[in-house]
Amino acid sequence: MGSSFGKLFTISSFGESHGGGVGVIIDGCPPRLELDINEIQNDLNRRRPGQSKITTPRNESDEVEILSGLLGNKTLGTPIAMVVRNKDHRPKDYSEIKKTFRPSHADATYQKKYGIQASSGGGRASARETIGRVAAGSVAKQLLNKSAKTEILAWVKRIHDIEAEIHPSEVTFDEIEKNIVRCPNQSAADLMIQRVEAFGKEGDSCGGVIECVVRNPPIGIGMPVFDKLEADLAKALMSLPATKGFEVGSGFGGTYLKGSEHNDPFLPSDSNQLKTATNNSGGIQGGISNGEDIVLRVGFKPTATIRKSQKTIDEDGNAITLKATGRHDPCVLPRAVPMVEAMVALVLADHLLRQRGQCPD
């Protein structure tokens, strides 16, 4: 219940932050897809903790083990099971707060819903759960690239009040990965890093916005009316930990425009491809991809677990003062970049297979 996603290209994630490991089972991946296992590991490396001075110091190698579904590097069409073992979990870091409700964390709501919670490391509410998503998303990215030459890139657009000027059509992977904050605008990245470090030293945290572009998306994917492409993207991305907002194309900014300003005029073309003069729609019209770049943004709140003293209650409702210990990201955004890419890829791969099934021509 709640740990599976997709209709044809489906995933089920499992594991807790301080359990034996975390992983995913992919069902519905087409057979004979040749996978680059190094790409899966590289995406996990971009997500893993301890990779820079502005991420949690938890030291995990996050080496993926593929248990089933492949013959050599080719998919069999059977379930693909992948797992990453937890090696650096420290339950003792949570011994003093295991009966405490951290403000804005999932502790309280998990307890109220289930009557029990994984008090060590946040359990399923931990960002460590996303390891399975990133691994599965890497498979989905390879499927999309081989099927339609689709490229999915995400980057940090804003941290706190520092926003970068970025043109989605021009961003490259190397520009994104050249600094530890994963912002392709270097001058803005330098300021972002300083801001995250400053808040971390204060025992505080900050949030921001990740932007994502899909180039060469499959045309015509999306299922009206309840499975519109942007609706499924919103659900997928808002299922990531710490997300609080989603927009596609012009987003909320488009509400300030007139129709004559916002409409994307179609251009004459000799090919069967749709071309528009502008892209305020963000590559999606009527819930269906039109072939233009899909551009979207996701808002992430500040990390809930901080070292500053906060007023809260324990499981019995008693007022207490909490000063959290343990290892936590002062800002989740640099590590969330591959998570966003993964969830976008999973949605697109699922809709690609659904489109092939309904409209094979």
UniProtKB/Swiss-Prot annotation:
Q: Which InterPro entries match?
A: Chorismate_synth, Chorismate_synth_AroC_sf, Chorismate_synthase_CS
Q: MF terms per GO, please?
A: chorismate synthase activity; FMN binding
Q: List UniProt keywords, sorted A-Z.
A: Amino-acid biosynthesis, Aromatic amino acid biosynthesis, FAD, Flavoprotein, FMN, Lyase, NADP
Per the UniProt record, which EC number(s) apply here?
4.2.3.5
One Gene Ontology term from the biological process aspect of the record: aromatic amino acid family biosynthetic process
Assembly and oligomerization: Homotetramer.
Q: Which NCBIfam families does the annotation name? A: aroC, PRK05382.1
Q: Which family does it belong to?
A: Belongs to the chorismate synthase family.
Q: What is this protein called?
A: Chorismate synthase
**Which organism does this sequence originate in?**
Prochlorococcus marinus (strain NATL2A)
